[in-house]
Amino acid sequence: MIEQEGTFPLPLFIIDLQWFAAEDEGRSEDPTETKLRKAREEGRVPKSQDLNGAFVMLFTSTSLFLLAPFILRECIGVLRFFFTRATTASIQNTGWFFVFVRYFMKLALPISFVALVSGVAANIVQNKTVLFSVKSIRPQFKKISPDVIRFFKRSFFSTEGLFNLLKSLIKITAIFFVSYFTIRNDLFMFVSLLGVSLTQSIFYITSLAGKVLLEVSLLLVVFSLPDYFFQRRQFIDSLKMSRQEVKEELKEQEGDPLVRSYVRKQMQSLVRESARNTTDADVVITNPTHFAVAVQYEPAYMTAPTVVAKGSDGTAYRIKRLAKEAGILIEENKPLARALYTQVAIGREVPYEYFNALVLIFTKLDKFKTHAQRKR
């Protein structure tokens, strides 16, 4: 023992508190949507096995309780069938095997179906959807590690290990007391079974067993709720990222910052050039606040009206301001402005289907009025 003045004796065996710290030290950032999506594609989702087991046990126990008369009747039927033919049946007769299989399927299929559906329902409750991933069932030999120290560290000296140990102790204790008090309340009924028939005794014992199963199942559902929230927190912690990992992911998604800066400068240059081309337009068609499209038409060398500038929000405001300063017609036409903005690139001709709408606008311009009068 190591003693210090004014202190309590310290044991030689000291547990390193770092064993209880987060294993992924330095990972302080919450996982991004991309990482969560990749984990989901790999079949890794927050899931409580206790909640799955509790759901399966609850619904299976309820089904057994409700189907008890049917199960008892079928069991008696199969016993009667084989016992009444025991002396006359031939071992070489394969028909008896199929009779047994038929009885077995009638007894097992309903319960198996309920267990399957309840298991799927538990997963849907936890993840709001049905998830199937082939990656999660592929063998991963890299997970087989001979690191015994790490195994014991994770199993006994980690937050998850301590939580699982405490959870198991509480569940065992609670199940024991629930079963004990349920049976103790009906303990005196066991004495009266000596004076009743075998069928009544079996019925009473199965009813009591079903009651215990239902109570224990409900208890397990209640106990599985904290485990569900704990597993969700552990899942998020396991996917946490360092700041460098977040930066790398953003770089992969959006490209290198230098490339993004170059692209942004090119886009700004195009916007400025587009705005300058506004002064060459004959008309500016607006949304009126969100979009602005400048259209030019010179019959002498153009086969169709051409979009020379366009923009949204701030760029649209600049285009309208330049058009107003240059005395260019600004025409409000929401459907046409939206269609030209989304479908026609700068420098491209306007599609034929919009000619009728443009003709109505261009006839308001003096130069096209003169051109039309000359044609007449």
Curated annotation (Swiss-Prot):
Main localization, broad class: membrane
Gene3D superfamilies, alphabetized: secretion proteins EscU (3.40.1690.10)
Superkingdom of origin: Bacteria
Record bears the keyword Transmembrane: yes
InterPro entries, per database record: FlhB (IPR006136), T3SS_substrate_exporter (IPR006135), T3SS_substrate_exporter_C (IPR029025)
Cellular component GO terms, alphabetical: plasma membrane
Keywords on record: Bacterial flagellum biogenesis, Bacterial flagellum protein export, Cell inner membrane, Cell membrane, Membrane, Protein transport, Transmembrane, Transmembrane helix, Transport
Segments traversing the membrane: 51-71, 97-117, 161-181, 202-222
GO BP terms in the entry: bacterial-type flagellum assembly; protein secretion
Membrane topology value: Multi-pass membrane protein
Localization, UniProt: Cell inner membrane
Family stated for the protein in its record: Belongs to the type III secretion exporter family.
Physiological role: Required for formation of the rod structure in the basal body of the flagellar apparatus. Together with FliI and FliH, may constitute the export apparatus of flagellin.
Name of the protein this chain belongs to: Flagellar biosynthetic protein FlhB
Originating species: Treponema pallidum (strain Nichols)
Gene: flhB
